[in-house]
Amino acid sequence: MVKVLVVGLGKMGISHLSMVRALCGVEVVGVVDANAYLLGVLRKYTGVATYGTLDRALEEAAPDAAIVATPSRLHAPMVRQLLDCGIAVFCEKPMTLSAAESDELAELAAERGLVTQVGYHNRFVGTFTEVRRLLDLEAIGSVTHGLAEAYGPVVLKPATGTWRSKRTEGGGCLYDYAAHVLNLVNWYLGQPCAVGGTTMTSVFSRETDDQVASTLTLPGGGSIALSVNWSDESVRKMTTRITLWGTGGRIFADRQEIQVYLRDGTPPPDGYQPGWNVKYTTELTPAESFYLRGEEYTAQLEHFVTRVRTGTLEGINTFASAAETDRLIEWLRRDAGQHRDPALAPDVPNGVARASLSARLRSLVTAR
């Protein structure tokens, strides 16, 4: 029996709690949250032990593993505390708000021989998994260009008041939406060698971004165009799409289907033929023991629990792989000018920069 502690009772925490309680061979030994009222209701109707602090839960619950679903800024200290106690960790994405911290936590987990996983659920979607399989088979040859997209109706009017509306808390389109497709890019093609032309635009939000666009340069010379918008009311819910062009064909995938075009002369994998091929998520996704929101959410938790039970360190979405995505996110922030690094550029106040620019323009006009 794997004893699991759930930390955080927001949207994702409640979702994870309902799913992990339904898994065979799992005992939820406690739930941690700062909201006493919410804990009281949960304790009354489920009988699950509840704790107001992580310290107390670790003293009394003795978990084998923990699911961390708190606001993103709290991930790093909580995950470090759990690892120091020898506890396997499933952490919601992004792992942390600092690539350096993510690297440190990945190294700490490796040193202690602990199972880790981050909640990039798209790697458990049948269509996206099939993309990875086809790329491993070199079905479309060398990838020369791609388009990574995510759209959704999250922020459709000015709003404040939650951590998701503040970049410093880990909120915003880049951390919440773009992270998912960037993680798929890492999975499919490795780490890009450069990013450029990044824009992070606010549509309705005051303190964070609602749209992200960029160009990612691949080590082999190809490129990926990134287009993400969580203020798009034309879609009913989050929609993630990947399109890849290669020397031997083209792949398009979203959650519902994968479309593959193979050029004549390209040896097709089993189940495919030259020209257009279409496969649907219903034929690519195995049935799960419990359904809520999507098969992939249960699948990722089953994968984590199985690895904890067997002590398998290698797996899908480990801390080490998630740290790559955190570093890519950091590169995009720097490229967009949202994060000024003193080592990269002097910290010039906006007023001084504007005055300096005005002086240069006047000198050019005078010279003419």
Which functions belong to the PLM regions below?
Residues F204-E207, G222-A299, G315:
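NAD(P)-dinucleotide binding in Rossmann-like oxidoreductases
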Residues N122-S205:
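Predominantly a Rossmann-like dinucleotide-binding segment in NAD(P)-dependent oxidoreductases
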Residues G30, A65, H145:
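Short, Asp-centered acidic motifs that coordinate Mg2+ and/or phosphate
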Residues C24, Y45-G47, C85, Y188:
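Short, structured coil segments at secondary-structure junctions
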Residues V48-L54:
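Conserved SAM-binding strand-loop segment of SAM-dependent methyltransferases
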Residues L58-E60, A65, P71-S72, A76-R123:
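Beta-strand-loop-alpha-helix segment that lines the small-molecule cofactor/substrate pocket
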Residues A65-V68, S289-Y291, E296-R368:
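C-terminal helix-rich "cap/oligomerization" subdomain common to oxidoreductases
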Residues M1-Y45, L361-L364:
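N-terminal Rossmann-like dinucleotide-binding module
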